């Protein structure tokens, strides 16, 4: 087999010239596409979910199936997997980048819970938002490929709802979606949303992640509401940073954070997470982005 990556003798001059020409064309197209990616209008729907376990249905399945024991003879307690999950809360927010302004257009976030809506109404509203986003817009989650998307497809089948285009391609690398957890992790150890956020200095989760299921089952939907909203705000900031670092969008991170903060606070003025955590952080981000050089915090100097 001839290696055309090395310069051939005179007999292969034409082939070598063709190879160089093709390489230049490919490199030119890649550079042009990268430039166009950041300058064309783009839209992203960032979403997050919380669940309520259908324990009665799961217990019935376990009873019919029969108990399973481990090597010591102890009965195993089966994990309640996604076919037995009810969507208890969902939040989403749409970010639009026109390719020219450094400030994204942020649509007011939406939060829906079982306190005010049936599950099928929650699904219809989310699916309608995805349909309105269009085929060029992308759905953004943190770890959505692991559970959330499976639940959405399952519920669409259960209720007879047409799935939005963003759920059709079942590949975890589908162009219509971004799983940020998978994207930033690649082959490294997977991390939780609040774990990544803590490392990046972004506020997250007003309630401990392990407690949210208990809050759902206790019907504490005011706390659940703030929690799922917080997850979307955190994920949105991570998404903006990730997309900007890849050159897919052009965005001023300080003003982008303030845009998310201002729109969200106007939509949910009573949110404790926004008032106590996110808005002070966003203002700090804006101040820091306007200063040149190193910005020292009091706790860093002490």
Language model features: what each stretch is:
Residues 1-302:
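DEDD superfamily 3′-5′ metal-dependent exonuclease/proofreading module
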């Amino acid at each position: 087999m001839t290696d055309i990556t090395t310069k051939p003798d005179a007999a292969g001059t034409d082939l070598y010239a063709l190879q160089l020409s093709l390489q230049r064309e490919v490199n030119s197209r890649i550079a042009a596409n990268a430039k166009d990616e950041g300058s064309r209008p783009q839209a992203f729907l960032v979403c997050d979910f919380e669940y309520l376990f259908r324990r009665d249905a799961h217990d019935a399945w376990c009873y019919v199936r029969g108990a399973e024991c481990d090597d010591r003879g102890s009965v195993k307690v089966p994990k309640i997997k996604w076919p037995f999950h009810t969507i208890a809360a969902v939040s989403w927010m749409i970010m639009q980048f026109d390719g020219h302004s450094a400030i994204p257009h942020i649509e007011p976030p939406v939060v829906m819970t079982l306190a005010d809506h049936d599950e099928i109404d929650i699904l219809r509203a989310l699916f309608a938002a995805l349909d309105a986003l269009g085929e060029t817009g992308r759905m953004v989650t943190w770890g959505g490929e692991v559970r959330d998307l499976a639940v959405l497809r399952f519920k669409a089948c259960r209720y007879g709802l047409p799935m939005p285009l963003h759920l059709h391609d079942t590949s975890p690398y589908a162009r219509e979606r971004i799983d940020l957890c998978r994207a930033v992790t690649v082959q490294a150890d997977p991390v939780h949303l609040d774990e990544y956020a803590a490392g990046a200095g972004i506020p997250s989760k007003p309630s401990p992640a392990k407690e949210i299921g208990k809050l759902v089952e206790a019907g504490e939907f005011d706390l659940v509401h703030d929690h799922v909203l917080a997850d979307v705000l955190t994920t949105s900031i991570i998404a903006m940073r990730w997309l900007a670092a890849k050159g897919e969008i052009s965005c001023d991170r300080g003003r982008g954070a303030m845009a998310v903060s201002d729109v969200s606070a106007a939509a949910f003025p009573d949110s404790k997470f926004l008032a106590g955590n996110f808005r002070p952080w966003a203002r700090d981000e804006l101040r820091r982005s306007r200063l040149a050089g190193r910005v020292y915090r009091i706790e860093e100097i002490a």
